[in-house]
Amino acid sequence: MQFTTIVMTLAAAVAVTAYPGSSSAFGVGQDEHKHHSSDDHSATGASKGATCAVGSQVSCCTTDSSGSDVLGNVLGGSCLVDNLSLISILNSQCPGANTFCCPSNQDGTLNIHAACIPVAL
């Protein structure tokens, strides 16, 4: 019974945070990019549309979880948090639109990326 309650609470939290409206806490909304110049690049060298807000990082998933349900962002795919060396190796390209903005503040507890938001490059 407790396991079901925990899973349902986690699923509700993912449903609320994984699919925000046009503007989000991670800065991937269209309104955020209106004030930047056309040659704006993030710290990782990605293009203007691939920047994440302060406190979040670009993650690249190596397996496709786009067709999965709400828990696909938590359980599906194998995502790597972006580093400068990873982006230079991948040349800012992730397979099959599997790019996400994930929070970068890890507090040592169960660190699943439940709040990762898909972004288009």
From Swiss-Prot:
Disruption phenotype: Does not affect the ability of the fungus to grow in vitro on agar plates or in liquid culture. Does neither affect mycelium growth and sporulation, nor the frequency and speed of conidium germination. When the four class I hydrophobins (hcf-1 to -4) are partially silenced, approximately 10 times fewer conidia are produced an the germination efficiency of conidia is reduced by about 50%.
Similarity comment text for this entry: Belongs to the fungal hydrophobin family.
Induction of synthesis: Expression is increased during sporulation. Expression up-regulated by carbon or nitrogen starvation.
Residues of the signal peptide: 1-18
Cellular localisation: Secreted; Secreted, Cell wall
Protein name per its UniProtKB record: Class I hydrophobin 2
Coiled coil: none
Primary site of residence: secreted
Tissue: Expressed in conidia and aerial hyphae.
Record keywords, A-Z: Cell wall, Disulfide bond, Glycoprotein, Secreted, Signal
Organism for this UniProt entry: Passalora fulva (Tomato leaf mold)
Gene, per the UniProt record: hcf-2
Main function: Aerial growth, conidiation, and dispersal of filamentous fungi in the environment rely upon a capability of their secreting small amphipathic proteins called hydrophobins (HPBs) with low sequence identity. Class I can self-assemble into an outermost layer of rodlet bundles on aerial cell surfaces, conferring cellular hydrophobicity that supports fungal growth, development and dispersal; whereas Class II form highly ordered films at water-air interfaces through intermolecular interactions but contribute nothing to the rodlet structure.
S-S bonds: C52-C101, C60-C94, C61-C79, C102-C116
Residues modified by glycosylation: N83
Subunit note: Self-assembles to form functional amyloid fibrils called rodlets. Self-assembly into fibrillar rodlets occurs spontaneously at hydrophobic:hydrophilic interfaces and the rodlets further associate laterally to form amphipathic monolayers.
